[in-house]
Swiss-Prot record:
This is Glutaminase 1. Its EC number is 3.5.1.2. One of its GO terms (biological process) is glutamine catabolic process. InterPro entries: Beta-lactam/transpept-like (IPR012338), Glutaminase (IPR015868). It is an enzyme of class 3 (hydrolase). Substrate binds at S65, N117, E162, N169, Y193, Y245, V263. It comes from the Bacteria.
Length: 309
């Protein structure tokens, strides 16, 4: 596959930049409302030539829903497929990511998949560790290993901002506790979940996460398997079917690669056996995806022939 060059990325960002004006920040999490809606950055981490980047590629932002892929991988390592999927389903949903509707109307009453908030909260409740400090340290260690960046941490400011306003997520937790999906203390779970969502990365870190998943869990630079192949396969399948909120189907048609977005404006994607892509653009479309980030990936995929379909 032909290697993309930095000047191509810079030209692409200039071409797509006007799209940022069409999006809006995720102001329902107060701290995310402080981002610059004009920011736009990209990094591509290749299996052989390291990375290229352009724009606001070194600006820190929080993982938010991108962390759901990380914790799913950890929960599968900790508990195994049988247990994880006895509590959380495997099917996409046409409802908003924070909806309670399917929990009430689906039988058995379990979240449809790990990429919606209810499913992600159930997944986080499964993580091994004696307390939240140990569990959070495991999440951070995992992200640091995948990114090869030992400085990665979480933003307590963003975590606290989310914790103070997470009324709907608390509702999801109480409903799941009533139905035996989770059995832990709700406030402790909310504390851990908001911290996991507040892990800070930049586009280069995100692209390296994408590379590890593109290589089926193998790190071509450290020459070692970081995540078992079968676990990355499960994660990438969910990324295709549910990774871009209610635009997952359209994204599959227009871009056609496994990807996961977050409401801080991040998107990471993977091109199998080749590279990972990390994008930051906090101006979001109506579905909660980076509006310019989606367009960048659409143009790159068409240009480079990335689609898996």
């Amino acid at each position: 596959m032909q290697c993309i060059e930095t000047n191509n990325l810079q030209q692409l960002l200039e071409q797509v930049k006007p799209y940022t004006k069409k999006g809006k920040l995720a102001t329902y999490i107060p701290e995310l409302g402080n981002a610059n809606p004009d920011d736009l950055g990209i990094a591509i981490f290749h299996k052989e030539t390291e990375y290229i980047h352009a724009g606001n590629s070194q600006t820190l932002f929080t993982l938010q829903s991108i962390s759901k892929v990380i914790t799913l991988a950890l929960a599968l390592l900790d508990r195994g497929e049988e247990y994880v999927f006895s509590k959380v389903g495997m099917e996409p949903t046409g409802d908003p990511f924070n909806s309670i509707i399917k929990l009430e109307t689906t039988s058995p009453s379990k979240p449809l998949n790990p990429m919606i908030n209810a499913g992600a909260l159930a997944i986080t409740s499964m993580l091994a560790g004696k307390d939240n400090e140990e569990k959070m340290e495991r999440i951070l260690h995992f992200v640091r290993e995948i990114t090869d960046n030992p400085t990665i941490n979480y933003s307590s400011k963003v975590a606290n901002s989310e914790l103070e306003t997470a009324y709907l997520n608390r509702s999801l937790c109480y409903y799941m506790k009533q139905n035996g999906i989770i059995d832990c203390d709700i406030e402790e779970l909310m504390d851990l979940y908001t911290r996991q969502c507040a892990v800070e990365v930049n586009c280069i870190d995100l692209a390296r996460i994408g590379l590890i998943f593109a290589m089926d869990g193998y790190d071509p630079y450290k020459k070692k398997q970081i995540i078992p192949k079968h676990i990355t396969k499960i994660c990438k399948t969910f990324m295709v079917t549910c990774g871009m909120y209610n635009e997952s189907g359209e994204f599959a048609i227009r871009v056609g690669i496994p990807a996961k977005s977050g409401v801080a404006g991040g998107i990471f994607g993977c091109v199998k056996g080749e590279m990972g892509i990390g994008i930051f653009g906090p101006a979001l479309d109506a579905n909660g995806n980076s509006i310019a980030g989606f367009k960048i990936l659409e143009l790159l995929s068409a240009q480079e022939g990335w689609s898996i379909f």
